[in-house]
Design a protein with these regions (language model features):
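Conformational switch/transducer regions in large eukaryotic molecular machines and scaffolds
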Residues: 1-148
């Protein structure tokens, strides 16, 4: 429930990490965003999903938990992007220059209400701050059983 609050759940397979994350999100009144991995899921689909997640949390200003499972880690770039989200709130080069005006228009009213300013840099900073406040990353990682 805390702004910028994230979680990492580690346990053996079937221990209820994802169920616990969904229950905690429901209790906190936070929606859960889960990506659906298919055989053809690659970096392009990942980036599209991250754009949707950023629009939910940054433009729509909706608190959302991003539940990511270790079995969904198909490419190393996924982990790098999650690291960037956790450290700075953004993924470098996620948006093209042609996509930025729609984001600026989406946050302009809220930024004006918050007296944040109306330049492109100020609107982008407001967008990133909204993402950082509303996005809660939950990593659910498996730990193999120890034979000892």
């Amino acid at each position: 429930m805390m702004p910028r609050g994230n979680a990492m759940l580690v346990g053996v397979g079937g221990s209820g990490r994802q169920s616990l994350a969904r229950l905690a999100s429901h209790i906190a009144g936070i929606g859960v965003f889960v990506i659906e991995i298919t055989k053809l899921y690659r970096l392009i689909e990942w980036r599209d999903d991250m754009k949707r997640l950023f629009e939910i949390t940054g433009v729509s200003n909706t608190p959302t938990a991003f539940l990511f499972n270790d079995t969904q880690l198909k490419e190393q770039a996924f982990l790098e992007d999650i690291n960037n989200i956790l450290s700075s709130g953004e993924i470098p080069s996620l948006y093209g220059k042609d996509e930025l005006p729609a984001i600026y228009d989406g946050v302009r009213k809220r930024a004006a209400d918050a007296e944040s300013g109306g330049t492109a840099e100020e609107l982008w900073a407001f967008f990133i701050e909204s993402i950082r406040s509303n996005l809660h990353v939950i990593l659910a990682m498996s730990q193999p059983l120890c034979p000892y």
